[in-house]
Amino acid sequence: MAKNKIAYVCTECGGQSTKWQGQCPHCMTWNTMVESIIEASVPNRYASLTQTSELKKLNEVKMSAVYKRTTCISEFDRVLGGGFVPGGVVLIGGDPGIGKSTLLIQALSHMTNDKTQAACKVIYVSGEESPQQIAMRAKRLELEVSDIFILSEINLEKIIQSIEKNKPDVVVIDSIQTIYSEELQSAPGSVTQVRECSAQLTRIAKQLEVSMILVGHVTKEGSLAGPRVLEHIVDTVLYFEGDQNSSFRMVRAFKNRFGAVNELGVFAMTEKGLREVTNPSALFLSHHHEEVSGSCITVTQEGTRPLLIEIQALVDNAHGASPKRLGVGLEQNRLSMLLAVLHRHGGIACFDQDVFVNAVGGVKITEPGVDLAILCAIVS
């Protein structure tokens, strides 16, 4: 019998190395190599999981209209591209306590009680919370959850067996980092376990046309924990953003095969759960009774939605050898580049001044068209 071996696997690209290195030799990222057990090759391990497929011409493939099951939460449906697609796999990541489970239990409740759609059978697989905790949350939110089935299980084989037996329409896995397969000896949450469990759940979703929702953890840098290949396996990648000190939450689509990328949904956390914000521009603007310096309002495009956002800037004399460059919602390197452009082409030097830039509401600025508003706020 072949023995397992120890190797170092990159959490970003999944590349392997026989020894630890500070920089991944495959994708050149730093501090991403972690120790992992490489499973011994077992012949025909996945033979029972595959189905034979015949060769077909592309023009002979029968096409049918894609039916999207809406969540009855317009902001969430906007980010998803209209709703959940049968056979589609959605990955939702966010900080602990940001509201991922709350949003999903609200969406599932609306879907199972929506009389305008076909009946929806839902299985909520919880690997972190007990059924009692989930029931308490649903009661606190005053949700009707009589048609939602709870499965407290972290074994992949048992989860797949339950899905094949009950034939649900929607399955939620909370979270993918807690699931493990008996075929692998590594611990739950390891690179190997996350990759293989995600691949098998994706396979069963495509095979049975089940809408699969995977909840993922994020690292301290804000990226999804686990191998980068996880984001390539799924159809849609959503990030739950927001400040823990603020009641507002944002769901952003970073990848979507069935909708627009960079689409943004805005919510407000209340005692009764997440509430939609129908006018997000009001969130990203501060109200002044008179004109103030260091503020500029601009329009940015988030997916298919134009938004009004306010850029605030503060410039002060530096008291150290190296002036500070700090941007909230803006990358520091981008801010440094804009200050260099301002100095070179505008004749305004900030080399002896601290510069602080903030986007009201915590929105992340990615569109280059906002650069002019940033410079106007700094100059004013």
Task: Give a label for each model feature.
Residues 38-115, 120-137, 146-153, 312, ...:
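Extended interfacial segments that mediate partner engagement and assembly in macromolecular machines
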Residues 32, 96-98, 128-132, 140-143, ...:
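Conserved nucleotide-binding/hydrolysis micro-motifs of P-loop NTPases
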Residues 202-289:
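Phosphate-binding/switch region of NTP-binding enzymes
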Residues 10-13, 24-27:
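Short cysteine-rich clusters marking metal-coordination/redox-active sites
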Residues 4-6, 20:
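Short metal-coordination and nucleic-acid-contact micro-motifs, chiefly zinc-binding Cys/His arrays
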Residues 28-38:
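Short Cys/His-rich micro-motifs in 6-15 aa windows
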Residues 263-265, 271-380:
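Conserved P-loop NTPase/AAA+ ATPase motor core
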Residues 87, 95, 106-107, 111-200, ...:
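Conserved inter-motif catalytic segment of the P-loop NTP-binding fold
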